[in-house]
Regions:
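Short, Lys/Arg-enriched, disordered terminal segments
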Residues: 1-15, 23, 129-131, 153-156, ...
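Short amphipathic alpha-helix that is part of the acyltransferase structural core
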Residues: 1-41, 151-182
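Conserved donor-binding loop and adjoining core beta-sheet/short helix segment
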Residues: 28-98, 204-234
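Soluble sensory domains of the PAS superfamily and closely related sensory modules
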Residues: 49-51, 107, 191-193
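N-terminal cationic-hydrophobic initiation segments that often serve targeting/anchoring roles
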Residues: 50, 104, 245-249
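Short beta-strand micro-motifs in enzyme catalytic cores
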Residues: 56-58, 79-81, 137-141, 198-200, ...
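Acyl-donor-binding surface of acyltransferase catalytic domains
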Residues: 89-153, 240-244, 254-288
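Intrinsically disordered, low-complexity segments enriched in Gly and acidic/Ser/Thr residues
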Residues: 174-250, 254
């Protein structure tokens, strides 16, 4: 069964949950095996989730034994259910099934986003067997800026601004179903949060050919994506990626993470990224 965690529960089982996070077969994304997030970060995240109004921590209990820890959150305006932690020692199928049933009455018409490393085969195989939709699959890489030396990049690359915003919007919003569309990015760029977004545009003969968008958080720099006017282009990707990394190092960022496709792997490896694991994202729609 699933039980809402009390503060005492958190103190009792925090180490247990962290230990599960150190195994790709028993944990989910965000991963704590990336060499970036620490045990202290895990603890801070748990207590933060406990105190927020849009997140909860649940314990999975079977035969009076705690076997799992779910730290989830919701975004009401987007009908979005996601996870900070989904660490299950065993009985993964039962836990996923229970969480879906638990959520149906509490979050009708929401969509649950389950992100797992491919190593977590029990969870993934169960999601494949039910009415879920696989919407993403990527290879996860990280880079330490302490070990990164700035590289030369080609092309006419500029920061996004009010004059070229329409160029960016037209290119970026060609993909209609992404969460970080141009409207959300515009609001994020102009917000006063502790996350600083950056967007660079790659021009050829005054025509926008590609763009990269990434964010500085208190913990790391995260690259969210690279868009192209036409087909995937290795030179454009490499140039935008180097511009992003050079800028981030200059801004004293410490680490970065990047989720890439198979065709992009050799490019990120050539500039110093290290492979962590493969990521798979599944959704469940909580509709009647």
């Amino acid at each position: 069964m699933l039980k809402k965690a009390t503060l005492q529960d958190i103190e009792n089982y925090l180490d247990f949950s962290y230990n599960l996070s150190q195994d790709l077969t028993t944990s989910a994304f965000p991963t704590y095996l990336d060499g970036i997030k620490t045990k202290n970060d895990f603890y801070k995240s748990a207590y933060s989730s406990f105190s927020k109004s849009n997140s909860k921590i649940l314990l999975f209990i079977n035969n009076d034994e705690v076997l799992g820890w779910i730290d989830y959150y919701w975004i009401e305006q987007d009908h979005y259910l996601g996870f900070n932690v989904f660490n299950i020692q065993n009985n993964q199928q039962e836990v996923i099934e229970e969480f879906i049933e638990y959520s149906k009455s509490r979050y009708p018409n929401y969509t649950i986003y389950f992100g797992f490393p491919s190593d977590n085969t029990l969870s993934i195989e169960y999601l494949k067997s039910i009415d879920s939709e696989k919407i993403d699959e990527n290879y996860v890489y990280t880079l330490s800026f302490e070990k990164y030396s700035p590289l030369e990049c080609d092309g006419d690359i500029v920061s996004v601004n009010i004059e070229n915003w329409n160029d960016f919007r037209d290119l970026h919003d060609k993909t209609s179903d992404i969460y970080w569309n141009s409207d959300r990015l515009f609001n994020a760029l102009n917000s006063k949060s502790n996350k600083k977004w950056n967007i660079f545009l790659y021009y050829e003969k005054n025509i926008l050919k590609g763009c990269i968008y990434f964010v500085y958080t208190p913990l790391l720099m995260e690259i969210f994506g690279i868009d192209y006017k036409d087909d995937f282009d290795e030179n454009i990707m490499r140039s935008l990626l180097i511009k992003c990394l050079n800028t981030s190092k200059l801004d004293n960022q410490k680490h970065t993470t990047f989720f890439v496709e198979e065709k992009e792997r050799k490019i990120v490896e050539s500039v110093g990224f290290n492979f962590i694991t493969k990521y798979e994202l599944y959704t469940i729609s909580l509709t009647d």
